[in-house]
C-alpha cells in the first residue's frame, strides 16, 4: 500500500520488497510485538501551500524579541557586534556553503586555504605559535584544552578560576568527569581571580590553571601573574579569551599562555540564540602534536606550486580511537570562514578601532550608571561588560525593559550566590549614547 509519509509509488515499494525477499511492508516489522505498535494516524495538521506556510512561520518568528527590533545589552559570551555585509555574501557561495571535509586536497584548495587563513589570523591575534582549523564553540575548546593539559602533564587536577564563564566551566567539568579528573574552582576576589587562593590550591598534581581574559565580569585580569604561578608548579596555563579584545590588549601568548582558546562569534557570526558558533584553539609549538581537531598546512606540490593539505593527522581519530588526542574530528569551517571574512574586512586597524569603541562605550555606561546612583560592583579595567547592583530581581527588571524595546543584561544570581540582584551589562560598539542613557533611565525607574 502507499505510505502516508514516504514519497514513493506502490511500484517502487514492490520492487524494493522483491529485492530483499519479503512480500509486504508489514513483514519487515514482524519482530516488533503487536501490542507496542502505534495504531492510527498522528494528529498532524493538513498540508499547507508554500505561501501559507511562510506566512505562519513568519508570524511565529515575529514573536521573538531579536536584536534587530530591540536594543540589546545582553552579552555573557554571545555578543551583538557589527557584521560586515560581505560576510553573508561570501559564506553563501555554494563551494563554501555545501563543502564537506576536504579529504581530497586536489579539489578542495579553496576551502583549505580559507581554513589556513583563519588559523593564521587566530595565531596572530592570540600571539601563539599556531592555531587549529576551529572548534565547535568556546566551551568545547576550553574543555579540550583542559584534557590536553591533563594528558600532557599526566596529572589529574585542573584549577579553574571562578571568573571563567560558568557554562564553560560546566563543559570542562563534564569532560573531566569521564576522565576522572578533579576540577577545583579558584574563588574570585573583587571580580578577579584570588591570587592568594590560587597559591594555596596549586600543587604537583595540577595539570593546568585556567583563567579568562577579559573575564566573565568584563574585568581585565593580570594573567601574567597567574601564568607565572602555574609554571612554577610545572602546570600548563590555559587562557580563554575574547579575540576582539586582543585587538588592543597584550595577547596571551606574550603573557605566558601555553594554550589560548575562545569563541570567534564576535567576528561576523550572529548570536543565533547561542549557536552555532566558532571556537578557536591556539598553542605553543611544544603542544603542536597534541592539538585536537584539524590542522591545515601549506606545502608545495610536485610542480612547485603552493598548496594546502590537512596535516599531522595522526593526532586525530583517523588513528585508533584510544590513541587519538581528541575524538573531535570535525570543525566549524563555514563559521571559521565567516570570522575570517569579517577580520579581513575590518583589518588590523578596524579590529583595534572596534575594540577601542567597546572600551570607551563600556566606560561611558559605567559612569552613567554611577551618576544615576547605581553601584558598579567591580572597579578596574573593563572590556565590553560591567556588573551593576540592583535593588530588585534582575529577571523582573528585564521583563520591564523588554516592554520598552530593551533586552536587559544577564542575571548573575543564577550562577553566583554572592551576586544576587546583580546584572551583567554588555555594551558593544553598536550601542549609542542615547541607547545607553535610555537603559540607565529605564533601569532607574524599575529599580526605584
UniProtKB/Swiss-Prot annotation:
MF GO annotations: glycine dehydrogenase (decarboxylating) activity
Keyword hit for Oxidoreductase: yes
Domain of life: Bacteria
Entry keyword Oxidoreductase: yes
Biological process (GO), any one: glycine decarboxylation via glycine cleavage system
Keywords on record: Oxidoreductase
One Pfam family, short name: GDC-P
Catalytic reaction equation(s): N(6)-[(R)-lipoyl]-L-lysyl-[glycine-cleavage complex H protein] + glycine + H(+) = N(6)-[(R)-S(8)-aminomethyldihydrolipoyl]-L-lysyl-[glycine-cleavage complex H protein] + CO2
Gene3D superfamilies, per the entry: Aspartate Aminotransferase, domain 1 (3.90.1150.10), Type I PLP-dependent aspartate aminotransferase-like (Major domain) (3.40.640.10)
Transmembrane segments: none
EC number: 1.4.4.2
Entries under NCBIfam families matching the protein: PRK00451.1
HAMAP family reported for this sequence: GcvPA
Oligomer and partners: The glycine cleavage system is composed of four proteins: P, T, L and H. In this organism, the P 'protein' is a heterodimer of two subunits.
General function of this protein: The glycine cleavage system catalyzes the degradation of glycine. The P protein binds the alpha-amino group of glycine through its pyridoxal phosphate cofactor; CO(2) is released and the remaining methylamine moiety is then transferred to the lipoamide cofactor of the H protein.
Family: Belongs to the GcvP family. N-terminal subunit subfamily.
Protein name in UniProt: Probable glycine dehydrogenase (decarboxylating) subunit 1
